[in-house]
Amino acid sequence: MGDWAQLAQSVILGLIFSYLLAKLISIVVTFKEDNLSLTRHPEESQLEIKPEGVDSRRLDSSCGGFGGEADSLVAEQGSSRSDSVAGDDSEEDDDWEGVESTELDEAFSAATLFVTTAAADRLSQKVPSDVQQQLYGLYKIATEGPCTAPQPSALKMTARAKWQAWQKLGAMPPEEAMEKYIEIVTQLYPTWLDGGVKAGSRGGDDAASNSRGTMGPVFSSLVYDEESENELKIDAIHGFAREGEVENLLKSIESGIPVNARDSEGRTPLHWAIDRGHLNIAKVLVDKNADVNAKDNEGQTPLHYAVVCDREAIAEFLVKQNANTAAKDEDGNSPLDLCESDWPWIRDSAKQAD
């Protein structure tokens, strides 16, 4: 009886082992078959699954010569092999683009460093203002993209010019902006690369951050920093008019400082008072015989300023003081031309003048 029990047990174990072995073989066969089939991810492109034991470099080759199992794979997948090769080429192109982009970034950084170093050098050639503005616009596009900053006041000439240079470039690609920036620098300084490398080894970030001079703060923001820009030089009397300091203003005039003294932009204290909206200062200056028709370097009078800044009370005061409503600036515009507000009195004044 005991022998029969052992025999039955052996048979059962044998059956179990046979079942497991058959299952294992089935899994292996299924796995191999899966390796030879094409799978597709719902959100990704076709993937080429290669069978075990086949050299992947051979499957990626554009040549023939596949045998046996490899030939069967190509027949099943159709054009998937060519897609895979195209994908590999695309990845290689991306790699090259990355290298080119890095080289362009480095060249652009070297160019900007050279420009800031040249700007700090007073012996360097003077760059025309229109070129400065163009460089500024290209720099902003390359580093920040399209202009989204609000338009500065018309009275902030430098800031407005920079904003316009940036804004007119629209959605120019940063890479194109970098290339054009480098091109302009090369036109200005054909040997800039040698100088740029030397400057980089000497100055570094300090040279860039402290640069001022002919180029001005070319890479600064649009904030019009009147106290730090070397482009604008004002005397104390202009500062008092700008800040509305009546007592100090009167002391300056009484000490002999001309009431129509001009700053580096041709502005008088009256221009500054109106720019900041100080009607009381304007009245003090006019009382001290300030010229209500004085023109700055752009040909604009205090009335131009009042109209552009939409300061009706000051504009009306100036007109009553015989300010010329028809005075033309360098662009050929009079205060009347620039007036966008509905001020009947300024129209009536212009008619009376005619």
Swiss-Prot record:
Residues 104-194 form the ACB domain. It is a single-pass membrane protein. Residues 75-96 are annotated as: Disordered. Changing Y136A: Loss of palmitoyl-CoA-binding activity. GO terms for molecular function: fatty-acyl-CoA binding; lead ion binding. It comes from the Eukaryota. Keywords: ANK repeat, Cell membrane, Endoplasmic reticulum, Lead, Lipid-binding, Membrane, Metal-binding, Peroxisome, Repeat, Signal-anchor, Transmembrane, Transmembrane helix, Transport. Residues 86-96 have a biased composition (Acidic residues). Induction: In roots by lead. The chain crosses the membrane at residues 11-31. Pfam families: ACBP, Ank_2. Gene3D superfamilies: 1.20.80.10, Ankyrin repeat-containing domain. An acyl-CoA binds at Y136, G137, L138, Y139, K140, K162, Y181. GO terms for biological process: lipid transport; response to hypoxia; response to lead ion. PROSITE patterns: ACB_2, ANK_REP_REGION, ANK_REPEAT. Signal peptide: none annotated. Mostly expressed in roots and flowers, and, to a lower extent, in stems, pods and leaves (at protein level). ANK repeats lie at residues 265-294, 298-327. It is found in: Cell membrane; Endoplasmic reticulum membrane; Peroxisome membrane. One of its GO terms (cellular component) is plasma membrane. Its main location: membrane. Belongs to the ACBP family. Interacts (via ankyrin repeats) with HIPP26 and the ethylene-responsive element-binding proteins RAP2-3/EBP and RAP2-12. Interacts with CSE. Binds medium- and long-chain acyl-CoA esters with very high affinity. Can interact in vitro with palmitoyl-CoA, but not with oleoyl-CoA. Binds to lead ions (Pb). May function as an intracellular carrier of acyl-CoA esters. Required for proper phospholipid and, to a lower extent, galactolipid composition. PANTHER family: ACYL-COA-BINDING DOMAIN-CONTAINING PROTEIN 2 (PTHR24119:SF4), ACYL-COA-BINDING DOMAIN-CONTAINING PROTEIN 6 (PTHR24119). This is Acyl-CoA-binding domain-containing protein 2.
